[in-house]
């Protein structure tokens, strides 16, 4: 009985680590992604990101979450819906979700009028959210 309790307690204590990508997960996704982009895209991204790697940038959106200036972006890390629903039929969060966020990031990056600062910010978010999207239970 004691062993079972200790095992369950261990899982509960570390449960956030079990369902959370964390730095290593995001950086792994960033590194893998970097190996699959065209040279043209790589050059454009390096210019925009000041030479920082996709792996390094991939954690940016989590790093800014606790800053009050960026709190509005917190719901963009995930989407909630019932198990028997698909995204189109699910109730949407009025503050946005990861699907909305990816669309917004792409829209800014495609815009001819977006500033370099905005392009850099939304590219960093996009890199992170693609990693979040591929994490089960996120």
Give residue ranges: language-model regions.
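Bacterial Sec-dependent N-terminal signal peptides
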Residues: 1-24
């Amino acid at each position: 009985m004691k062993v079972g309790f200790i095992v369950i307690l261990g899982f509960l204590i570390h449960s956030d680590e079990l369902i959370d990508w964390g730095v290593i997960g995001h950086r792994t996704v960033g590194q893998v992604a970097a190996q699959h982009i065209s040279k043209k895209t790589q050059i454009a991204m390096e210019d925009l990101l000041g030479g920082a790697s996709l792996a390094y940038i991939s954690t940016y959106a989590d790093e800014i979450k606790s800053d009050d200036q960026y709190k509005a972006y917190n719901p963009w890390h995930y989407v909630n819906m019932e198990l028997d629903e698909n995204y189109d039929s699910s109730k949407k969060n009025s503050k946005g979700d990861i699907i909305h966020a990816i669309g917004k990031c792409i829209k800014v990056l495609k815009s001819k009028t977006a500033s370099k600062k905005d392009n850099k910010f939304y590219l960093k978010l996009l890199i992170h959210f693609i990693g979040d999207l591929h994490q089960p239970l996120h």
